[in-house]
Amino acid sequence: GELIRKSAMGGYTLSYHFMDLRDEKTNIQEKTAMDKPHHLMVYITDKNNKPVLKGKVGFMIKNAQGITQKAMGMFMSEGFGTTADMKQKGVYTISSKAILGDKKLVDKFEYEIR
């Protein structure tokens, strides 16, 4: 997926990647039938640039109308990912909270769907 944000905090780097799963589909009916066609991943690395493989990550995605989706990230491909419905054009506020042992990392940013 496309790198949409990179932030550093508390000795960690968080890299967010965004992907529209509909891009992989060729059948128009499959594309329109997808409830949550967007995939959001965060890859977390420590100060030595090693991937963080244990922890919990939660996502909160709010659209321009204030409708919020909450999801726990699943560990996959050395990162934490979730699916979401971001089909409506506009600016989304994406918040993440990562619990890594005794460390808590909270991040928030905006991403526009055009």
What role is predicted for each listed range?
Residues 1-39:
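Beta-strand-rich domain onsets/edges
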Residues 2, 25-28, 67-69, 78-82:
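Short structured motifs
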Residues 36-48:
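Beta-strand-rich structural segments
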Residues 49-53:
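A short beta-turn/strand-edge loop motif at beta-sheet boundaries
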Residues 58-71:
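Short amphipathic beta-strand segments in non-cytosolic proteins
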Residues 71-100:
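Short, solvent-exposed, Trp/other aromatic-anchored flexible loops in extracytoplasmic proteins
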Residues 104-113:
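Edge beta-strands of extracellular beta-sandwich domains
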